[in-house]
A protein has these predicted regions:
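Hydrophobic/small residue at the entry helix of a nucleotide-binding pocket
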Residues: 93
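Glycine-rich Rossmann-fold phosphate-binding loop(s) that bind the pyrophosphate
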Residues: 90
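Extreme N-terminal segment that seeds HTH/winged-HTH DNA-binding domains in transcriptional regulators
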Residues: 1-29
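Phosphate-bearing ligand-interacting subdomains
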Residues: 21-24, 126-211
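NAD(P)-binding Rossmann-fold cofactor-contacting core
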Residues: 104-126
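HTH-adjacent hinge/linker in prokaryotic transcriptional regulators
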Residues: 30, 34, 39-82
Length: 211
């Protein structure tokens, strides 16, 4: 049985990966946990604890080899393999995500777009045709789907999510304005963009009130 890793640790791993990539681009070959802590705004001890969950990777007196740590964290995050993605909801948000080419650099390949709006049928985004939802079962029969991105309106999202689960899809990146409640064997990441904006608003107001 694999060791259970806390979600707080997992949330920090992509940040480590991004920063290590920046260090590689800058030609940095090694870095200490103290130097990492300044950038990450967590303690050096926390960084060591986080990485020790997966084996450590550092050497006392040397620090971390940036290239090696970058590659190992990439493996931890599953970036050493391809993930096939479909986008369910081909409106503005869905099309924006389909147009984001950097996903492919991380191995996230958008292979299908689906919607419930007949006006979108047959259109394409970056060469990917938009299909209607009733075509989804046939698509899934012939194409491996690892992740579904859900960008439908709230009132249609739950039914679509249930359909995705019935078709055997076990990971959903949910941008609909509700938290999905799905079986335990389905991995769901609920993303509420307005939450981040409200946090920003809070910090603006607090700063203004303190001036």
């Amino acid at each position: 049985m694999q060791k259970e890793i806390s979600q707080a640790v997992i949330r920090r791993m992509p940040r480590y990966y991004r920063y290590l990539g920046e260090l590689l681009d800058a030609g940095v070959e090694r870095i200490s946990s103290n130097e990492l802590s300044v950038r990450m705004k967590v303690t050096a001890s926390q960084i060591r604890q986080d990485l020790n969950n997966f084996g450590g990777f550092g050497q006392q007196g040397y620090g971390y080899n940036v290239q090696y740590l970058y590659e190992e964290i990439g493996k931890i995050l599953g970036l050493d393999r391809q993930h096939n993605i479909i986008v369910v909801g081909a409106g503005h948000m869905g099309q924006a995500l389909a147009n984001y080419v950097k996903f492919e650099k991380r191995g996230f390949m958008i292979t299908g777009l689906f919607d419930v709006n007949p006006a979108l049928a047959g259109l394409s985004v970056r060469g990917i045709e938009i299909h209607m939802m009733d075509e989804l079962p046939e698509f899934v029969k012939h194409q491996r789907v690892d992740i579904a991105v859900l960008t439908l309106p709230k009132e249609k999202a739950e039914q679509a999510a249930e359909q995705l689960v019935k078709l055997g899809i076990r990971a959903i990146w949910n941008f609909a304005h509700l938290d999905l409640e799905l079986p335990d064997d389905v991995v769901v990441e609920n993303v509420h963009l307005s939450d981040s904006l409200m946090q920003l608003s809070y910090n603006i107001v607090r700063r203004q009130d303190n001036e």
